[in-house]
Design a protein with these regions (language model features):
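Non-heme di-metal
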Residues: 1-186
Length: 186
């Protein structure tokens, strides 16, 4: 079942309170919108890593759709807070300067299980980020969005953890290797 059981239309956009927006939070949300929306690059890369695993590839495709939705919703909020924010232009610049292993045909972390360890670390960190964003803002729409996205990110952590368990026996990464991968993503 997809984590995102909500749509952008369910956000209480009419409750937006511009007086509750601060510049640092706005900058963080703009950046998060770009990273989340850039999921297509991650999906393409992970699709190569898990080329022989239809189950994991389907989960990754669903994850990517949810990440893109997060980016769209965060960008919409950022444009409410800053009507001059041109998300499409910012996304073009972002993609020109940041590419995720475009030439890799296998995991850059040594194995599929290693890749899943890295994803677990990232999803855990992003869920914490969105919980902090939710708890640290007085702006009601952002609070709602951050809560929904945090919930999705916790689900994504579990999705990648379950996939890790499916791959762990075949890849046999020792404790030192798992720690190296995890610390490399912190």
């Amino acid at each position: 079942m997809p984590a995102t059981a909500w749509t952008p239309d369910q956000i209480d956009w009419h409750r937006f309170a511009p007086e509750q927006v601060d510049a640092r939070t706005l900058a963080a949300v703009k950046t998060a919108a770009l990273v989340e929306f850039n999921a297509d690059d991650y999906v393409a890369y992970l699709g190569k890593v898990f080329a022989g695993d239809a189950v994991t590839r389907a989960e990754i495709a669903q994850w990517g759709a949810e990440e893109r939705q997060h980016g769209e919703v965060l960008a919409r909020w950022a444009q409410l807070a800053d009507p001059d924010f041109d998300f499409d232009r910012a996304m073009t610049r972002f993609r020109a300067g940041y590419q995720i292993h475009p030439d890799a045909v296998a995991s850059v972390r040594g194995s599929p299980a290693g890749e899943l360890i890295a994803r677990c670390v990232v999803e855990c960190g992003t869920s914490s980020f969105y919980c902090s964003l939710r708890d640290g803002t007085g702006e009601p729409v952002l609070r709602q969005i951050a809560g929904l996205v945090a919930r999705d990110e916790f689900h994504h952590y579990r999705l990648f953890l379950d996939a890790y368990h499916r791959h762990a026996a075949a890849d046999r990464i020792g404790l030192a290797g798992r720690l190296r991968i995890a610390l490399g993503r912190v």
